[in-house]
From Swiss-Prot:
Induction context: Induced in the hours following cyclic mechanical strain in keratinocytes.
High-level lineage: Eukaryota, Metazoa, Chordata, Craniata, Vertebrata
Tissue-by-tissue expression: Expressed at intercalated disks in the heart, where it is colocalized with CDH2 (at protein level). Expressed in intestinal mucosal cells (at protein level).
Effect caused by changing E102K: In ARVD11; uncertain significance; abolishes localization at desmosomes and partially mis-localizes to the cytoplasm
UniProtKB keywords: Calcium, Cardiomyopathy, Cell adhesion, Cell junction, Cell membrane, Cleavage on pair of basic residues, Disease variant, Glycoprotein, Membrane, Metal-binding, Phosphoprotein, Repeat, Signal, Transmembrane, Transmembrane helix
Record organism: Homo sapiens (Human)
Domain Cadherin: 136-243, 244-355, 356-471, 472-579, 580-694
Disease: Arrhythmogenic right ventricular dysplasia, familial, 11: A congenital heart disease characterized by infiltration of adipose and fibrous tissue into the right ventricle and loss of myocardial cells, resulting in ventricular and supraventricular arrhythmias.
Intervals, Cytoplasmic compartment: 716-901
Protein name: Desmocollin-2
Topology within the bilayer: Single-pass type I membrane protein
Effect of R203C: In ARVD11; fails to undergo complete processing into a mature form; fails to localize at the desmosomes
Length: 901
């Protein structure tokens, strides 16, 4: 029993040891290492306390919880306060509970918060020797995710300087996001150097921030250089890719080959380039109509191509595609956008036009022209009103004579068959045409390897028509000898009836006959010579004389034709020398060439025979002729004749002996060329005649004309010195003063004794219209006496210094510009008595005239009949002058002024 007790005690101790070890293992397995965080005495709400490494303790935790409600734990281990906390000198702790809900595993982390009063360290004074130590003050990589959800302020990193071991360091920052826009985005804790962000940031607006961190002591000393700190904003896939257009429109030709490019679409993404966020993939997600699938899209470039060659515009002319672009390289979680793409199918000429009928029948009357006889239609499935649809017709067979043409109606696309050249029923009653049609645009070889032209047959029946005479051929000829006797007849123009092919019943009429040489028989069309025919006449061209003939039938239908009369030549013209003046330069030239012509035909012309007229021996002695060819000979002098002009008669005969004599004026001249000939007289010939050149004659004529001009000018100037006033007609003194200063010849008249002094001014001169006038001067007044037809009259013209009543009284010269003279028997009767009236006035004291002096009166206006007024008054006298006693009021004052008071 006693031995057993120690054994039992040992067993109990062993069990207690095992239980203690198990408890320690269990506790060790549930708890992780403790974490101590140094914090200030006061913690504001939602302030970052620190960060705990949760992964180190429990990597599979999916539930995080804090034992103290004043603290909140995030997934990354960040510890934030939920309320404002004041710490005492004692420690404060809480537990972070980590658990996995799947396997019910749990872990704990004990967190201790300690408040440690920071002792300000004094900066070393100069008396203390400083030892040089290596410092670390370099940029620390820093980044933050754009559009972060917080919680804010979001801790970014801690900025620390190694000098904090020796000094009390205060941290501060400046730059964009701090004191520059966007302001107050970042801040740093002065004591700890912790850098925080206060709100979310959009990378598309700010890709990064470069701020400057400063480390200073409380007294302002800066132991470190400013630290450039770059904060990069990490991109988040928060932007959708966007197509550059809402709707894309492309056009492609039908029947195109597989792989033909239709077009290219493009999209943009504002996220960070060269990342998965901007790696785009394109695709087609829908097509209208849905079948068949004819298009594909390259996923990277966005190029749309065809997958089939069966695009047919006549079936479907437009396709609509729904396209998509997605970022993240097209993965299912990428952002995507859709757009619309419209593809229009353009037409090509893949359908040939075909006639709706293969044969047509039509008819037309003969002799009709420029008429439409048939319209043909075609079918074409290509696009209307395009070159692929418009038809182009042509006549393939049956139009060898060019009677028809076919054109296209631009509005209906029909073929219009027309007659452009008249048809003849008597020649052909039916014509068969083959017509074909193609398009304006060439046929597409991609649609069909071969193309065939559509053809149709057109039968044209020619209908008979009662025609007029036919002038066929339109130009006919007859032959007649020139100089044929008047009345000679010949066959004329013949027209035919196309129905009977005969000329019976046709009447003929001459329309044109330039010289009236022939007449035409009305019934037969034969011609008769009316005047002698001359083949060499100017109206004849190439020996043919043309007349125009009109042929008509009984129905009045007509045709016209031309009859050419070929005139057969007879030898009726002698050869002659057209150039009748010859210059031979002596001694450089010893001869001259002379040429003869003959208007007749060559059969009656050359060779010509040239000879000197043998009537005078002097010609034979001085000249000789030598034939050069059939139409020319050489004339040369002999025996050294003197310079001068000679007449040399030459006889020219044609081959039939008809001849003529031409007298040549031959000049022997001392010259080198003919143009230099001055016609000098040979010194051996004395007293030769002198001849004037054309320029000398012209100079003499001009000199004579100049002398005549000078003489004419002198004559005109002499006649102009005599003052000849214009003649003003005396209109029978109707309410005007009668001209009373007439000095007519005759001894049996009583002259005025009023003391007028007269002086002859100039001799009489011939007037323009044949009136002779003579001028006298009366004091300061000029008087012109005009004599015509035995009657006499006179008018006065005031001199210089007074108003002129006549336009001709200028500068002392007068001109007669009017040929009208109003003279009558009344003047012949009254003029001799005017002198008596003046004489009686002087005898009467009560009616004595004023002293003789020139009276000046104001001009009453242009055109006044009484242009000048004399100084004499008259009283009543017999012989019809009683009207002077009863003057009208406007003349009384004038009469009183002329009387002596």
């Amino acid at each position: 029993m006693e031995a057993a007790r120690p054994s039992g005690s040992w067993n109990g101790a062993l069990c207690r040891l095992l239980l203690l070890t198990l408890a320690i293992l269990i506790f060790a397995s549930d708890a992780c290492k403790n974490v101590t965080l140094h914090v200030p005495s006061k913690l504001d709400a939602e302030k970052l306390v620190g960060r705990v490494n949760l992964k180190e303790c429990f990597t599979a935790a999916n539930l995080i919880h804090s034992s103290d409600p004043d603290f909140q734990i995030l997934e990354d281990g960040s510890v934030y306060t939920t309320n404002t906390i004041l710490l005492s000198s004692e420690k404060r702790s809480f537990t972070i509970l980590l658990s996995n809900t799947e396997n019910q595993e749990k872990k704990k982390i004990f967190v201790f918060l300690e408040h440690q009063t920071k002792v300000l360290k004094k900066r070393h004074t100069k008396e203390k020797v400083l030892r040089r130590a290596k410092r670390r003050w370099a940029p620390i990589p820093c980044s933050m995710l754009e559009n972060s959800l917080g919680p804010f302020p979001l801790f970014l990193q801690q900025v620390q300087s190694d000098t904090a071991q020796n000094y009390t360091i205060y941290y501060s920052i400046r730059g964009p996001g701090v004191d520059q826009e966007p302001r107050n985005l970042f801040y740093v804790e002065r004591d700890t150097g912790n850098l925080y962000c206060t709100r979310p940031v959009d990378r598309e607006q700010y890709e990064s921030f470069e701020i400057i961190a400063f480390a200073t002591t409380p007294d302002g000393y800066t132991p470190e250089l400013p630290l450039p700190l770059i904060i990069k904003i990490e991109d988040e896939n928060d932007n959708y890719p966007i197509f550059t257009e809402e709707t894309y429109t492309f056009t492609i030709f039908e029947n195109c080959r597989v792989g033909t490019t239709v077009g290219q679409v493009c999209a943009t993404d504002k996220d960070e380039p060269d990342t998965m966020h901007t790696r785009l993939k394109y695709s087609i997600i829908g097509q209208v109509p849905p079948s068949p699938t004819l298009f594909s899209m390259h996923p990277t470039t966005g190029v749309i191509t065809t997958t089939s060659s069966q695009l047919d515009r006549e079936l479907i002319d437009k396709y609509q595609l729904k396209i998509k672009v997605q970022d993240m390289d097209g993965q299912y979680f990428g952002l995507q956008t859709t757009s619309t793409c419209i593809i229009n199918i353009d037409d090509v000429n893949d359908h040939l036009p075909t006639f709706t009928r293969t044969s047509y029948v039509t008819s037309v009357e003969e002799n009709t022209v420029d008429v439409e006889i048939l319209r043909v239609t075609v079918e074409d499935k290509d696009l209307v009103n395009t070159a692929n649809w418009r038809a182009n017709y042509t006549i393939l067979k049956g139009n060898e004579n060019g009677n028809f043409k076919i054109v296209t109606d631009a509005k209906t696309n029909e073929g219009v068959l027309c007659v452009v050249k008249p048809l003849n029923y008597e020649e052909k009653q039916q014509m068969i045409l083959q017509i074909g049609v193609v398009n304006e645009a060439p046929f597409s070889r991609e649609a069909s390897p071969r193309s065939a032209m559509s053809t149709a047959t057109v039968t044209v029946n020619v209908e008979d028509q009662d025609e007029g005479p036919e002038c066929n051929p339109p130009i006919q000829t007859v032959r007649m000898k020139e100089n044929a006797e008047v009345g000679t007849t010949s066959n004329g123009y013949k027209a035919y009836d196309p129905e009977t092919r005969s000329s019976s019943g046709i009447r003929y009429k001459k329309l044109t006959d330039p010289t009236g040489w022939v007449t035409i028989d009305e019934n037969t069309g034969s011609i008769k010579v009316f005047r002698s025919l001359d083949r060499e006449a100017e109206t004849i061209k190439n020996g043919i004389y043309n007349i125009t003939v009109l042929a008509s039938d009984q129905g009045g239908r007509t045709c016209t034709g031309t009859l050419g009369i070929i005139l057969q030549d007879v030898n009726d013209n002698s050869p002659f020398i057209p150039k009748k003046t010859v210059i031979i330069c002596k001694p450089t030239m010893s001869s001259a060439e002379i040429v003869a012509v003959d208007p007749d035909e060559p059969i009656h012309g050359p060779p010509f025979d040239f000879s000197l007229e043998s009537s005078t021996s002097e010609v034979q002695r001085m000249w000789r002729l030598k034939a050069i060819n059939d139409t020319a000979a050489r004339l040369s002098y002999q025996n050294d004749p003197p310079f001068g002009s000679y007449v040399v008669p030459i006889t020219v005969r044609d081959r039939l002996g008809m001849s003529s004599v031409t007298s040549l004026d031959v000049t022997l001249c001392d010259c080198i060329t003919e143009n230099d000939c001055t016609h000098r007289v040979d010194p051996r010939i004395g007293g030769g005649g002198v001849q004037l050149g054309k320029w000398a004659i012209l100079a003499i004529l001009l000199g004579i004309a100049l002398l005549f001009c000078i003489l004419f000018t002198l004559v005109c100037g002499a006649s102009g010195t005599s003052k000849q006033p214009k003649v003003i007609p005396d209109d029978l003194a109707q309410q005007n003063l009668i001209v009373s200063n007439t000095e007519a010849p005759g001894d049996d008249k009583v002259y005025s004794a009023n003391g007028f002094t007269t002086q002859t001014v100039g001799a009489s001169a011939q007037g323009v219209c044949g009136t002779v006038g003579s001028g006298i001067k009366n004091g300061g007044q000029e008087t012109i006496e005009m004599v015509k037809g035995g009657h006499q009259t006179s008018e006065s013209c005031r001199g210089a210094g007074h108003h002129h009543t006549l336009d001709s009284c200028r500068g002392g010269h007068t001109e007669v510009d009017n040929c009208r003279y109003t003279y009558s028997e009344w003047h012949s009767f009254t003029q001799p008595r005017l002198g008596e009236k003046v004489y009686l006035c002087n005898q009467d004291e009560n009616h004595k005239h004023a002293q003789d002096y020139v009276l000046t009166y104001n001009y009453e206006g242009r055109g006044s009949v009484a242009g000048s007024v004399g100084c004499c008054s008259e009283r009543q006298e017999e012989d019809g002058l009683e009207f002077l006693d009863n003057l009208e009021p406007k003349f009384r004052t004038l009469a009183e002024a002329c009387m002596k008071r």
